[in-house]
Design a protein with these regions (language model features):
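Acidic, turn-prone loop/beta-hairpin segments
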Residues: 43-73, 102-178
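An acidic- and aromatic-residue-enriched active-site/binding cleft used to recognize and process polar
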Residues: 3-6, 17, 24, 81, ...
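Residues that scaffold the ATP/ADP-binding catalytic core of kinase and kinase-like folds
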Residues: 1, 99, 145
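Structured ligand/cofactor/substrate-binding pocket environments in proteins
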Residues: 12-36, 86, 90, 120-143
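Short helix-adjacent coil turns
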Residues: 76-83
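Core structural elements
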Residues: 24-37, 56-68, 85-106, 160
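Catalytic adenosine-cofactor/nucleotide-binding cores of aminoacyl-tRNA synthetases and other
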Residues: 1-54, 150-156
Length: 178
């Protein structure tokens, strides 16, 4: 994630703190993926549950994922690599890891099989899409993590770029959640 914060046409200086931040981000992503994988049953098959099973936090994270996918696509279309990298970094660190995984933990351990299954499905779905969005910036790490996901294809490189899915857009839930 060394391109995070870079601007088109400008040289970047080597900054040790930026290297440390990139290492910390990769470690955070690696640990988040390990957490998700260790909470999946062996017979898990990926796929989002029906909308009526999603709770407010699920709708919130899916809305945020939609927003970051749309914004990153626009940034990359305009060759704004630094902005795109910053957006996926912020989404993975701040939204997915710091909030959604923490919110999902009680559901995973609640004893309610349906709630736990819904949480697992959303965790895997969002992680899959986030890895695809991050892939241009961290190809080796994202490939390794993607291969560990259940139902993953041969390689992340041949997968479709995540696009905005209007069916996963809940602005009311997003506003109420925040």
């Amino acid at each position: 994630m060394l391109v995070d914060g870079s601007t088109p046409g400008n040289d970047m200086r080597y900054i040790e703190k930026k290297v440390e931040a990139a290492r910390n981000f990769a470690n955070k992503l690696w640990n988040a993926t390990r957490f998700v994988l260790m909470n999946l049953p062996e017979d898990f098959t990926p796929g989002l549950p029906s909308e009526d099973k999603l709770d407010m936090s699920d709708k919130w994270v899916l809305t945020k994922l939609n927003q970051v996918a749309g914004a990153m696509t626009d940034n990359l279309d305009h060759y704004e690599m630094g902005l795109a990298a910053a957006k996926i970094n912020s989404f993975i660190w701040d939204v997915y890891c710091d909030w959604f995984i923490e919110i999902a933990k009680p559901r995973l351990n609640s004893g309610d099989a349906e709630q736990a299954d819904t949480a697992r499905r959303v965790l895997v779905y969002v992680l899959d899409k986030a890895l695809k969005l991050l892939h241009p910036f961290m190809p080796f790490v994202t490939e390794e993590l993607y291969q560990a996901l259940p139902g993953s294809a041969e390689t992340i490189m041949t997968q479709e770029w995540p696009t905005v899915d209007e069916a996963h857009n809940w602005p009311e839930e997003e506003e109420a959640f925040e």
